[in-house]
Amino acid sequence: MRSVTEDFIPCNREEIETRLERKMDGNMRTGRERQQRNLGIDLLRIFCMFLICILHVCGQGRAMVRYAGREEVWYSVYILETAAYCAVNTYGMISGYVGVRSVRRPSRIVELWLRVFWYSALGTLIAVTFFHLPVESDTLYQALFPTMWKTYWYFSSYVGVFVVEPYLNRLVKSLGSTGKKKLMITLFLLCSVFTMVPRVANRDFLGIGAGYSFLWLSVMYIIGACVRELTDQNGPERQKQECSEPGGAETSITETENTAGVKEQKEQDSEKNVDFLHRSGGLYGMLYIICVLVTWVSKILIENWTTSVYGEARYGRLLFSYASPTIVICAFCLLMIFSRLKCRGRVLRELIQFFSPLAFSVYLMQLQPYFWEYVLAGRYQFIAKLGPAAACLMVLVMAAALYLECTAVDLVRMAAFRLLRIRRVAQVITDFALRPFAELTEQENREASGEV
């Protein structure tokens, strides 16, 4: 083990200053993050899972059955599904937004896998034993090997993202503000805009899988991480801190004698950075609504036109996909809106802290194979027979009820996990599995906390 003095043997004065700046900045930042959790992001998790419930009510629940002569009901409910379609992308961006500045805890993925296995295996056992539902080989494989069989496609893809997360973080942190923006724009154009037309023709030349893939979640992770880094570097509080500290992030101590012209240029660049990601929440809200309407209207117009020309609806999913540019922009807008929310009030904060850890289980419960096929399928078809306004209201009510239903079930799982001390079990499994990589993991944690 190295001594304390060995860590601070300087090569020159600049190295001392750089190390001290980095150490002080990292300590202040991590201290603030430990004390002030961003409840806006936790609220966004809850909201996104509610949107996913809307998708499942409309889709598998068949609330969007299109009856002849009742197209107005289908159109009205479809706008709700369009507004909710960005939820998965937003979840991916949240992972990057939080993960780029969080201390990595490998046992977390083991805990999540045990939660997934709880719902897949135990749910199958209950369905077969108590409800005498049929067992097929494929269903059994899905229950016992939920990750490899993609029982829950999002979790299967997220496992890959979790493995490469440290390297994605290093990529983002190695870039300057301009580089991060260029990376975000490049990924958006390459993976979303340029794949739009080939996707309509069922051509997936980048292997994005219409957003159902590890590659796509990695792209969303990087965008979320870039947003976090840019907002932390260029936020109003950060700017004030840099202006009050000699030799801040824009100028080191040894560079204070630079020309006034260079300083003015940096100030102008800083103002541009602030303008880019610190617009008002109302602007992002308007942009979200515009993108939802564009996606919704385009689907209706394209399908009606192709029906009149070809006799059947075609190309309606031009903008209706996880990888669609408008859907990605919607997800980005939600992230920007909720990340700056100030959740005041003790009751509101307690509700957010209660529901947020349970949000992911709402997804697991709904995607459980037997629940998906025998409980959720066609459950809400009666909604399609209501009027337009009543149908929209009922979709929202049923989605909220489904969310609370799954949350109540997960409380049982949470109590069982505490009784079985699953967190401790996950930590033991992780320590044993990662013993050869312990030094690398410690290095990654130091980098994430700003100590290196």
Language-model-detected regions and their locations in the chain:
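Alpha-helical transmembrane segments of multi-pass integral membrane proteins
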Residues: L125, E303-L419, E439
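Interfacial loop-to-helix transition and helix-capping segments at the boundaries
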Residues: Y75-V88, Q142-S157, R199-M220, W296-C333, ...
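Solvent-exposed interhelical
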Residues: V163-L189, V227-E242, G261-L287
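Aromatic-anchored segments of alpha-helical transmembrane domains
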Residues: F50-V57, Y119-V128, L187-V200, Y288-N304, ...
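Juxtamembrane "helix-exit" motif on the non-cytosolic side of transmembrane helices
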Residues: A63, T129-S137, M196-D204, S298-G311, ...
